Amino acid sequence: MKRRPPKKREVAPPIVAVEGSLAEPLPGWAPAVLVGGATLVMLAWTWGRWPDLLIDFSRDLYTAVQLAHGRVLYRDIAFFTGPLSPYLNAIWLRIFGTSLHALVGLNLIILGGFLWLLYRLLREIGSRLAATVSCLVFVTTFALAHLVPMGNYNFICPYSHDMVHGFVLGIGAIYALARYTESLSTRMAWAAGIQLGLVQLTRAEISLPVLLACACGLVAMILRDPRVRSLRSSLALRVVAPAAAIPLLVFLLMACFMPWATAFRGVLGSWVWVFDPVVGTMAIYRESMGLDDLSGNLGRILAWAAIYTGVLLPPLVFALRTRSNQRGRGAVLVLLAGLAAVIMAVGWRHTAPADLARPLPFVAAVIGAMTIFALAKDGGGEPARAALTVRLMLSVLAFSLLGKMLLNARFHHYGFILAVPATMLAVLGLVDFIPGWIAKRGGSAGAFRWASVAVLAGLVAIFLQLSATCLARKTTPVGEGGNTFIADSRGEQVNAVVGFLAREVPGDKSLAVVPEGTMINILSGRTNPAYCTNLMPPELATLGETNVLGDLERTPPDVLVVDLDRIGPQGLRFRKEVYATRIAAWILAHYELVARFESPPTHPMRIRLGIMRYQGGAPSAVDPASPS
């Protein structure tokens, strides 16, 4: 049977068919120059200051290094998300060397590829200008921003590589389905299915939104596009088969090296946490989602929605009342918006920047609802349906990702991934969707468009200043060779600890850091013999304190580096929570404090580290957390 030739790709961006005619002010070369230039500037500015010294990121680096040296994930070393990211990183490190710089190189490549992918996806539903502005916001506010003092929440040294890899694969799957709606290419269907299979090997909070988004897209294609409807069986096979087969094949492969139950839990990844009632009720996750202060967070969402409405409504009315040929009045609007942006950039410390993302769930829901309504009308032909289907998938992804912080949406922290799709939709709305609606009514779309760009520039200026404030704290060089980076002042104590270990502890002695901080293992070149290398509440809740303690008793590390502010006779401490009472008691009973390294009491990033040596059954002579 002769195959149908692929349909020629539409030259005009689909948004033109959906929202009305808009001018394209940027030449074809501008996006690459602007986005590429901004990325290079941000990289140069933040270079070497991406990771946090002790928290989160080093867990992924240490795990990948251990896998590269032959240990087996889940069997020899505990891990609580899917196997894709650890093994991808381990393969790369096995080839290019087990160092921080090698992993940074991989992440730079992923970031470059993702920028291309994000731009192409946004061009499926938006103009060149809107896609370019969106990518600029992404680079400066998410990918390379430094919005909290610790670092971690960026695409180069992320707190969790599973978040980045899963998100990239999710956007890739949506883009593949977008291309399928245009060309009915079987390769694009297979590409979507393969990426859906891989994304399930990352994290539940990423894989579930991606699956929901793609499922909604497939349903919309089948219901609204006669071409796809006639091919629905083959489409379902090509998408669903690899999405189901890849996790199954990985499970069977892992089962060759460990018990089946262990392999199954490994493939489930963080789904184990999703259904764990103890983890789900932890204060950190309730606070992240906004459930700790329900009425207060709802009030903040409404307040910020009202603020944004108050900011955007006057220029919207002004643009509607201004004809497109009244350039003078349009210029006045743009100048006023520019003035507002300058005021925002200068007075940002009085705007509670941590709350600026609060209305994002509302934005994603409204755009999604309007997209469903437009699809139900079934107007505009194939290009319009294709664009609306892509917009629907992006809207579902945006709203679903925000579920982890639904009442506490933010650009920082988890928001460096979870808030990206909703923010991209908001930018498209300001630069394309609303101006297109204005143009259809004869108003000055260009004036509102450039006014929106000015306001967005003001928001970006706020976050650049936040990044500058946080980056200014990082002035202490840490590490040697391929593991060098620049840390905050805690690096002075870490350098002292690493130096002490090199001088006083034989190189074959094992080391654990309590409760977290495997970067010290990396910097000192020492292995943690324990199965669980991160003694934080979620890990202990999943494995059970009894099991973790039993493993420590069987293979006690020769030396501990302990955060003295987070251990005492009552247990380990995390924020206001006290946990792991028996583990803390065992440490105090079997380890002796031999050295301590402390920041001055008045230091803003104060840390107190102690080195403890294993003494068998001999109890520690002092409470290590007591003042020296």
Q: Over which residues does each language-model region extend?
A:
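Short periplasmic/luminal acceptor-recognition loop of GT-C membrane glycosyltransferases, typified by
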Residues: 80, 470-479, 483-539, 548-569, ...
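Hydrophobic/aromatic-rich transmembrane helices and adjacent perimembrane loops
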Residues: 208, 354-370, 383, 388-392, ...
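Membrane-interface transmembrane helices that cradle and orient dolichyl/undecaprenyl
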Residues: 165-191, 221-229, 300, 304-319, ...
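Start-transfer (signal-anchor) and selected internal transmembrane alpha helices
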Residues: 1-44, 235
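Short hydrophobic alpha-helices at membrane interfaces in multi-pass membrane enzymes
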Residues: 176-198, 227-241, 330-339, 389-398
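Extracytoplasmic catalytic/substrate-binding loops of multi-pass membrane glycan-assembly enzymes
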Residues: 48-63, 72-91, 98-102, 258-260, ...
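Membrane-interface alpha helices of multi-pass inner-membrane proteins
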Residues: 187-204, 210-218, 244-245, 250-251, ...
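Transmembrane-helix motifs of polytopic, lipid-linked glycan transferases
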Residues: 105-134, 139-144, 172-175, 317-318
